[in-house]
Design a protein with these regions (language model features):
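Canonical positions in the second alpha-helix
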Residues: 4-5, 38-39, 73
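Structural marker of alpha-solenoid helical repeat scaffolds
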Residues: 8, 42, 76-80
Length: 100
């Protein structure tokens, strides 16, 4: 279903995000990250995409990339005035730092 939506509208952020989550939840992490990359390149202020991409990167033990993703996500959330998303990403960033 999501692939059908994306075939007609490749920039549909909701469908792209949903597909990335499906891949991540099913353990297809490289596919998930590719979808998050597509999502964020066409929707750079989609804050939830950064957060979930960072979580997927952590599942792949790509801590430095997850940190960078969160930093970009915090900036995106601040551009949109989404303090809640920025706060969640700051928390995750602190947790990643504490795990070292």
């Amino acid at each position: 279903m999501l692939n059908e939506i994306l075939a007609q509208d490749p920039n549909n952020a909701f469908a792209r995000y949903g597909l990335a989550l499906e891949y991540s939840n099913s353990g297809k992490l490289d596919h998930a990250l590719a979808e998050f990359e597509k999502l964020l390149s066409s929707n750079p202020d989609y804050a939830a995409g950064y957060f979930m991409a960072a979580q997927t990167l952590m599942k792949s033990d790509r801590r430095d990339e997850a940190r960078a993703m969160l930093e970009n996500g915090i900036a995106a959330a601040q551009r949109k005035g989404d303090g809640h998303a920025a706060s969640e990403m700051r928390e995750m960033l602190e947790e990643i730092g504490a795990e070292q």
